[in-house]
A protein has these predicted regions:
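Sec/Tat signal peptide C-region and signal peptidase I cleavage site
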Residues: 17-22
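Short tyrosine-centred short linear motifs in exposed loops/low-complexity segments
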Residues: 115, 125-129
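Short acidic/polar inter-strand loop motif in beta-rich domains
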Residues: 136-146
Length: 177
């Protein structure tokens, strides 16, 4: 009887254990801008669907993500912690001390740990990098807001940029993945 109870308890514990996620590496501390919490991270390249030309995960060094969630003071009607949809998020990465740079637009996507904006990217090897994100509000993607007195919310924020500096150690190194 005791063995059955122990097995049952272990089975229940295993069923409530959170799923294992790929190890994310923070690019910098989260910041709050215009009622939004921004937190950029990277992890190993991932496979995504639908697969568009140039999206083969094997050809990249990392998967770049930025989580964009509502702050407790979000004036556009999003609940605290809610993911903000319909953004246009572009990025530019420069290797410090050199000429190398890359840029692109992140795609809205979801994963086991929730929705985010992301893309598989290449780095120019290990080194110190600066990344700049440009965040454009939802009306650029045709997401509207109420403006009447009874149900309206504050106007969308103006497009803005945020930057971080970070060290990329490369694949398979401590601080890499």
């Amino acid at each position: 009887m005791r063995i059955r109870i122990v097995c049952l308890v272990l089975g229940l514990l295993a069923s409530v254990t959170p799923p294992a996620f790929a190890r994310e590496h923070s690019i910098g501390n989260p910041v709050v801008v215009d009622g939004l919490i921004l937190h950029p991270v990277y992890l190993q390249p991932v496979h995504m669907a639908p697969v568009l030309p140039g999206m083969d995960g094997a050809k990249f060094d990392a998967h770049l993500e930025i989580d964009v969630h509502a702050d407790k003071n979000n004036p556009q009607g999003f609940d605290p912690g809610a993911w903000i949809p319909y953004l246009t998020v572009s990025y530019e990465i420069k290797k410090m001390g050199g000429d190398w740079s890359t840029f692109g637009t992140l795609l809205a996507m979801t994963a086991a740990d929730g929705p985010h904006y992301g893309a598989n990217i290449r780095f120019d090897g290990p080194g110190k990098y600066r990344i700049r994100f440009r965040i454009m509000p939802p009306p650029y993607q045709a997401f509207f807001r109420h403006t009447d007195k009874e149900t309206g919310v504050s106007p969308w924020w103006r497009p803005f940029e945020e930057s971080w500096e970070f060290t990329y150690l490369g694949v398979g190194h401590k601080g890499g993945y």
